[in-house]
């Protein structure tokens, strides 16, 4: 792949996995309330993906690194609607609307050149500069994602009580709750993957969901932020019917819900609530003071669980779309 052409006073140089930590530093500097983990970034920048094409760049100004840029899209054979995702960030000292505009222009050119028909971009809902830049470029708001934070100190007794109640209910209903580390089924990863694919199809979205290969799912299970003894699953006999996982950043960041899902056959039976209660009770035992989670604004069942657990809403995100 050729480097993207320079725009404005910025230049774009193809990035390597070793540049991922710098990208994490940039995102952390822009949004210190949501630190990003360099080890996690580098791991994921190092991984292939069977169904996606990625292009990443270090953005320079006068030869100095000031940011990064990304252009990615699913392989068109798995997503014929041809959505292309563009993004990037700049250090706060260099972060202007004009320079963000230059990043978007360069990345849009790249994905459109690859055949994208609809452009997608993301902004935190309190990021005025990025939002104004996207609107000027013709993007329209598509969907909102809600973000929540749970104070584990203030809600400790309530959460432990909910955990105990859920354990009792699951026991009566024949649902076994355990960690991935405690499960001895050699096919457990495949079962969790199949469950997650089923649940993923039910998450509200505008962009068609791209199937996730089992190899990608296995890489996630082995990622540095994931611990098998903190990875909770629900079983009914041989079937895996639920999963909930908190990610623990190795270097910096807030512990965050990576994924919660249940099979269609057990929804409304308290399985998701039981799993989420186990994850936060374990976090309390590990000395974590708060956890965060995010969900599509239209995902009412999970939003309701968040509210009952004591999560408080914090600034979320907005997905923007623009036809080519």
Annotate each PLM feature:
Residues 16-20, 27-126, 236, 240-263, ...:
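Conserved donor-binding loop and adjoining core beta-sheet/short helix segment
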Residues 96-109, 262, 268-281, 304, ...:
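Conserved acetyl-CoA-binding loop-helix of GNAT-fold acetyltransferases
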């Amino acid at each position: 792949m050729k480097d993207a052409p320079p725009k404005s006073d910025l230049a774009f140089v193809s990035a390597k996995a070793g540049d991922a930590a710098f990208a994490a530093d940039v995102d952390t500097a822009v949004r210190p309330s949501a630190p990003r983990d360099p080890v996690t970034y580098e791991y994921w920048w190092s991984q292939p993906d069977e169904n996606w094409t990625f292009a990443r760049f270090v953005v320079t100004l006068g030869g100095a690194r000031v940011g990064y840029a990304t252009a990615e899209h699913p392989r068109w054979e798995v997503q014929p609607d041809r959505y292309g995702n563009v993004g990037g960030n700049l250090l706060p000292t260099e972060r202007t609307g004009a320079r963000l505009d230059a990043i978007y222009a360069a990345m849009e050119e790249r994905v459109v050149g690859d055949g994208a028909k609809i452009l997608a971009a993301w902004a935190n809902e309190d990021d005025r500069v990025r939002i104004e830049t996207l609107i000027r470029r013709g993007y329209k708001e598509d969907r909102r994602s809600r973000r929540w934070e749970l104070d584990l100190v203030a809600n400790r007794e309530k959460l432990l009580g909910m955990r105990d109640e859920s354990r009792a209910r699951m026991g009566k209903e024949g649902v076994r709750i355990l960690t991935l580390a405690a499960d001895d089924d050699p096919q457990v990863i495949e079962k969790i993957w199949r469950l997650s694919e089923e649940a993923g199809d039910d998450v509200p979205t505008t962009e068609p969901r791209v199937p996730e290969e089992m190899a990608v799912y296995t890489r996630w299970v082995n990622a540095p932020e994931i611990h098998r003894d903190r990875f909770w699953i629900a079983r009914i006999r041989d079937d895996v019917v639920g999963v909930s996982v908190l990610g623990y950043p190795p270097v910096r960041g807030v512990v965050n819900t990576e994924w919660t899902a249940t099979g269609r056959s057990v929804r409304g039976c308290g399985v998701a609530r039981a799993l989420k209660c186990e994850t936060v009770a374990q976090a309390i035992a590990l000395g974590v003071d708060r956890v965060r989670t995010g969900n599509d604004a239209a995902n009412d069942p999970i939003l309701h669980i968040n509210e009952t657990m004591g999560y408080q809403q914090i600034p979320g995100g907005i997905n923007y779309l623009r036809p080519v």
